[in-house]
From Swiss-Prot:
This is Probable Ufm1-specific protease 2. Keywords: Hydrolase, Protease, Thiol protease, Ubl conjugation pathway. It is an enzyme of class 3 (hydrolase). GO terms for biological process: proteolysis. It comes from the Eukaryota. GO terms for molecular function: deUFMylase activity. It holds the Pfam family UfSP2_N. Belongs to the peptidase C78 family. The active site is at 441, 565, 567. PANTHER family: UFM1-SPECIFIC PROTEASE 2. It comes from Drosophila pseudoobscura pseudoobscura (Fruit fly). GO terms for cellular component: endoplasmic reticulum; nucleus. Thiol protease which recognizes and hydrolyzes the peptide bond at the C-terminal Gly of UFM1, a ubiquitin-like modifier protein bound to a number of target proteins. Does not hydrolyze SUMO1 or ISG15 ubiquitin-like proteins. Its EC number is 3.4.22.-.
């Protein structure tokens, strides 16, 4: 019986954007009673497949399952037999045939007894994905004692993977008494026949946070549970299960309580070969259908560790091949959640190799090409890595994220929405104990804009404070010394200066002689959100706001603006902010007809 085929809506959008003849590999999850869900693809190098370089970057359970062909590419047929031999999760590998730049005419076929059999498919949208699937994230540590040769690294990594798979590890779900070992789960209520969803429901929400969730819940999709809000990745709506790792002999935590020392230690063995003891801090992920039986979880977690070790091995051996003298370095796991993918990807980067070094730039460029991503914006820099909510909550304070999600519609007849592209934090009056009511609105708009560049991975610079802004403007001779420490407001020109000074970001300044003329720049704002996607600061008189979208009807000229209002002075309660209109759609009567307005429109740097 052939598998039932489903395709992620995220994947379909990515396939639609490919406009060059090419071929590549497909990756998916096999779950339930015979359903294959396609989630991702990569493009192959000209004339050869490269899935062996790619597959360890995916979470465990997200595996090679077939081939995709774009246009009249002839490589696909040549590679089909190779892929068929390498697919493990199904006896019927899949072939997708896509036209260039469109989903019209896309055909899906399973390979059955040496022939292709065309099959229908269903589309799984984002809400169903978030409902039906979750991720695990575990952290553990090992030491790798090896000589600085690819052969020795491969040999010792193989030994280490065998140790991982020998049944001596036990997994524990934090904040519970639930243990997972090679014979199944150990808990009074959960059994091997229990489902992953039962485990999700058994994980308690940290005390004191339930009310916060209730306040924010109205703006989230129904699929997003409290577990996603408290432990998931920033900007990601999947539930996430954290896992601790223990050895069955000692019950000692391998990772969270005692991570390995981050330095290399050197030893000389009797083999007359210098060996280094490399600390490996593993951070591994897996993707699971929530209806999966709990008895499978142990094997999946073991595979996630082994997959992370293979990624470390690949990174170490690449470095040994490229570096003169063959030196070892400490690898680190970095997880990414690229916008529009609908799944995580992992990279292993070596300590001591900065993001701007040519060798790192070349590796990222290769990743961009393999995943059909533009090389005009960052996806895999360290600053792009995921921030997980449990870790973010440990910080003294974090602003609200993406406050526009869930706002009431604009009600523009036949309008089209153009929105900020990516994540941002909402900054407003009185945050961080700064008494800036009446003068700090533009500073707050600047902080919101800076947060966008941080969260999109363009920089990891800290968000500038009011005082830092004032000191910088004095430093460049824009303001007198009396400005530093004052309560004087700033405008769009100063915002553009600060963006250049703090982030090296250029800005475009638009001038409008009155609020009544704002509709004349609606199309320009729409183009800005399509091409740049950054928040826009608008200043008029002594007031500043942040524009994060427009809804515009070309035929009628009707336009509304999606506004973040920095003048809000209340608590960070999302429901209040949306209901009271501090974040929401504003019509033309929001703007003063007698005031001129300047808009600071930040431009994305070309960076990857």
């Amino acid at each position: 019986m052939l598998p039932k085929l489903k395709i992620s809506a995220f994947l379909l959008k990515r396939l639609e954007r490919v406009k060059q003849q090419s071929s590549g590999c497909l990756y998916g999850v096999f779950y339930g009673d015979g359903t294959l869900l396609l989630l991702s693809f990569n493009l192959s190098n000209v004339g050869q497949l490269n899935y062996e370089q790619i597959q360890h970057r995916f979470p465990a359970e997200l595996d090679l399952c077939g081939l995709v062909k774009f246009g009249d590419c002839t490589d696909a047929e040549a590679h089909l037999n190779e892929v068929i031999k390498s697919v493990d999760i199904t006896d019927n590998p899949i072939l997708l045939k896509c036209e260039l730049g469109t989903l019209v005419g896309m055909r899906a076929s399973f390979f059955v007894h040496g022939k292709l059999e065309e099959v229908p498919y269903d589309v799984m949208d984002s809400e169903q994905l978030y409902n039906d699937f979750c991720f695990t994230r575990l952290q553990c540590g090992f030491y790798l004692q090896t000589a600085a040769t690819p052969e020795c690294v491969a040999k010792e990594m193989h030994v280490l993977r065998k140790r991982v798979a020998d049944g001596n590890l036990v997994f524990k779900v934090p904040h519970t008494n639930i243990y997972i070992h090679s014979c199944g789960p150990m808990d009074n209520k959960l059994r091997g026949e229990s489902r992953i969803n039962d485990l999700v429901q058994a994980i308690p929400i940290p005390s004191g946070k339930e009310n916060v969730v209730a306040d924010k819940k109205k703006s989230k999709t129904a699929a997003q549970t409290q577990l996603a809000k408290h432990f998931g990745a920033t900007g990601c709506e999947y539930d996430l299960i954290n896992i601790d790792v223990m050895r069955i002999r000692t019950r000692d935590l391998l990772a969270r309580d005692s991570p390995p020392h981050p330095a290399l230690s050197i030893a000389v063995t009797t083999e007359e070969q210098t060996r280094a003891q490399v600390p490996l801090e593993i951070e591994a992920m897996a993707m699971l259908c929530k209806n999966t039986k709990l008895q499978r979880l142990y094997d999946v977690l073991i595979e996630s560790i082994c997959r992370a070790l293979r990624l470390f091995e690949q990174s170490l051996n690449e470095h040994l091949a490229e570096s003169e003298g063959g030196s070892l370095a400490v690898p680190r796991s970095h997880h990414f959640y690229p916008q529009g993918f609908g799944h995580f990807l992992s990279c292993a980067y070596l300590e001591g190799l900065g993001d701007d070094e040519p060798i790192m730039q070349e590796r990222r460029k290769r990743l961009h090409r393999q995943f059909s991503l533009p090389v005009t914006r960052p996806y895999f820099r360290r600053a792009n890595q995921c921030h997980f909510q449990g870790e973010v909550d440990d910080a003294p304070w974090t602003p609200l994220l993406n406050t526009h999600v869930g706002v009431r519609p604009s009600a523009v007849t036949d309008g089209k929405e153009y929105l900020v592209n990516g994540n941002y934090h909402y900054y407003h009056y009185l945050q961080q104990q700064v008494q800036d009511k009446g003068w700090g609105c533009a500073y707050r708009s600047l902080q919101t804009i800076c947060s966008w560049f941080v969260l999109q991975g363009y920089t990891n610079a800290p968000i500038p404070t009011h005082l830092e802004v004032q000191k910088y403007l004095h430093k460049i001779n824009d303001k007198p010394s009396s400005f530093v420490g004052s309560s004087q407001w700033i405008g769009s020109t100063e915002i553009s200066m600060c963006l250049q000074g703090f982030l090296k970001v250029d800005s475009k300044i638009l001038h409008v002689s009155s609020g009544a003329e704002l509709p004349t720049i609606a199309s320009e704002l729409a183009m800005h959100f399509q091409t740049q996607g950054t928040p826009v600061m608008i200043g008029g008189g002594v007031l500043a706001h942040t524009i994060i979208g427009v809804d515009y009807c070309v035929q009628s000229g009707e336009v509304k603006f999606l506004i973040l209002d920095p003048h809000y002075t209340g608590a960070d309660e999302l429901a209040t902010i949306q209901i009271k209109g501090w974040c929401g759609w504003k019509s033309m009567d929001f703007w003063s007809k007698g005031s001129y307005y300047n808009l600071c429109m930040p431009q994305r740097p070309i960076l990857y």
